[in-house]
Amino acid sequence: MKELLTPEALLTNLKDVRALTRKVIEAFPEKDLFEVNIANLRPFSAMVEEFLRVMDYLFKERFQEQHTLFLEGAFPTTKTEVLALWDRATEILDREWTKVGDYTQPLTIYQMTFSFAQWILYFIENESHHRGQGYTYLRALGIEPPFFWARESFN
């Protein structure tokens, strides 16, 4: 049976999602990235921290990274630092992706076991969901968010 989603296509999709989320981070004014929330939801920076923590956990579990992207309680406090950390995570992803090997191999994260490919799909859905919250915050601030369909690989 032919693969429905190749590792290369999965990486392209993940990187498209991450690039779009980066544009949303960039669209926020500095202060609002860390402070604005609606209906007691987290500020967008806290959602970005979640994306990076999950990615960091993946790096440690699957890629055997010997470091963490940031220490507990030490998430960046400026947009410039957040974007630099985001880019560092992307560099690690690019460097380590070819080392994954078997994308069907099970991986347990947060007491849930899925294949590596399923975890990447989970990350994509989780990030897309929370990015939608970021879009709502931007619109509430009177800022037009990036087009949700504007993926780099579509060019």
Which residues are covered by each model-predicted region?
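Extreme N-terminal tail/first-helix region
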Residues: 1-14
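Short, contiguous alpha-helical
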Residues: 11-15, 19-22, 30-72, 111-155
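Acidic/histidine-rich alpha-helical segments that form the ligand environment
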Residues: 76-109, 114-137
